[in-house]
Amino acid sequence: MGGVELDMTKKIIGITMGDPASIGPEISAKVLVDKEIYDRCNPLIIGDASTMRKALELIGKEDFQVNAIKDVEDAVFTYGTIDVYDLENADMNLIKPGLVSKEAGEASFQYVDKVIDLALEGKIHATVTNAFNKEAINLAGYNYSGHTEFYAEKTKTEKYTMLLAHENLRVLHVSTHVSLREACDLVKKDRVYDLIVIGEEFCKKIGIENPKIAVAGLNPHSSENGLFGHEEMEEIIPAIQLAKEKGIDVDGPVPPDTIFSKAYGGMYDIVVAMYHDQGHIPLKVLGFVYDKERQVWKEISGVNITLGLPIIRTSVDHGTAFGKAWKGTASELSLKNAIDYAIRLSKK
């Protein structure tokens, strides 16, 4: 790394390539041919160098060099050269674009495992993940419902949460990848309180000095004093009261059908949602733009951030998009958003 120290102004951001059969290699290439990224950070792809070369060819950027390395110290961090921490594990003769496979699952999981190791060892300042496919990693023998759960296990983190962000709308989730029936059972006072605290800490990290937090209800109209359920009275309101006693500026339970409009309009800085779809739907209505004529996603923006970890982890807010894989038409906007947040968080 030419004597560059970890306390340099530009932080080292480790970016996983994602499933080799997905849009991950393409959008990684598209982001790293943008000089602005190199002006703001030192990006390092964790993936397969030969696959990245193919991705550069796909987008017509064969003139860019790929620097395959086995140690972060060997990165050059220079525009025009893409540094790849090369695991040499993606045989594109076996891995077919757009198809689920054990081989792609194995490769993509190894990228995540390695980027976490590099962050824990202090060799990089933040991690950004492209999507892996849950079916593919399970075929490879890794039984995780997503990145978040693996990050938590590997870093030995007990209190963590998924945050989604699009523009000024930021949403935390009490639960994520569980059934709706189970999600209702997971709405507990301690969990809701922990997320309020985590949300306040996150807002302060990104420069919001006095954040205003809103907590969503679980039931329609936040149950109207127990008419439509008891979770608000028994679990959510006690958590909010405890947070207020600790000096946190928090409202709720706010009815779920209006809370996100209020937050997007500027009334709140961050929202605590009770389950996966309650929080994801409003974010994706805003960030995902569908082109009816072309029958494709015109734009995909937003970022997924795991809070509570000892390391920084941001991610694209979409899946592997196998239907668009290796066609040269995938949007890199969400990956740019994720890198932007990683840079901002790594400077705090």
Task: List the predicted regions and their residue ranges.
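Flexible loop/hinge segments that line or gate small-molecule binding clefts
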Residues: 145-171, 176-179
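Contiguous, glycine/small-aliphatic-enriched amphipathic segments in soluble metabolic enzymes
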Residues: 2-147, 193-214, 218-274, 278-303, ...
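N-terminal leader/targeting segments
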Residues: 1-2, 181
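Helix-enriched interaction subdomains in cytosolic or periplasmic regions
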Residues: 130, 137-143, 166, 179, ...
